[in-house]
Amino acid sequence: MKKYLYIVAMLAFFAGCTKAPEQDRAEELRNRILEGKTDKVLVVAHRGDWRYAPENSIAGIEHSIKVGVDVVELDLQLTRDSVLIIMHDATLNRTTTGKGRVSEWTLDSIKTLKLKNGAGIHTKHRVPTLEEALLAAKGKVLVNLDKADRYLDLVVPVLEKTGTTKQIIMKGGRPAESVIASYGDLLDEILYMPIVNLYKDDARQIMEGHMALLKPCAYELTYRTDDELDYPLQLREDLSGKALLWYNTLWDTLCGGHDDDLALEDPDAAYGFLIDTLGATIIQTDRAEYLLSYLRSRHLHD
């Protein structure tokens, strides 16, 4: 009896010493965004870091995770047999060894093709489905599904099947009322971020609607030139401590010329300007490793 009690006591002791499961990286990143403030800058790899691997490929996702990217941006297309795949263009021509519209090919046929790299050379990599991409990213990185609202009724079941709903970012340029009507309760699960082109006539109205109705955790902002800085500067002040600010450095007219190309010559004038002057806390880039190196040199990324 004493031996039995001893064993029970030891089992209880070791059970008490067992640590709770650690929070996965995607959950930690999600919580950081939900807080609406951070002393770091999050890095988004556009089309899954296409400079390293074919765009929208599993290899690109895996490399992004390896180097420390926080969000991978992926694009969706629908096959003839209604399967969501990861691809930017509506046609296969540019990024694969096939030709024609994605919507005219079945998944089985698309899986026979090879992805091309940035130079247009075919590789060993294949076109991934949405499900395959989400499983590669699960628990490791947040995923921005671009223009997912086109296929929302098909996307949601895949998110649920893979258990990745809470690591998904969706964005769009519609007014808050339209977003609420389309997304409904899904807004409680995903991270939704409005896209606001600050140079447009209705920009202030769109922003005010989102601030009042949705209160998003982050906003994607674009502007064309530094002659348009008044409103971006105002938003930095208005949203400080309330929401993160996402800027794109993919090309010049998204960020007033402070883009990836300028960053190769002067990263302080590009990335540094967006961070220090406009309060950028999320940057989407086509040069993820270069941006990460810059941020780490300033202790703005782990």
Residues covered by each model-derived region:
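Bacterial Sec-dependent N-terminal signal peptides
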Residues: 1-26
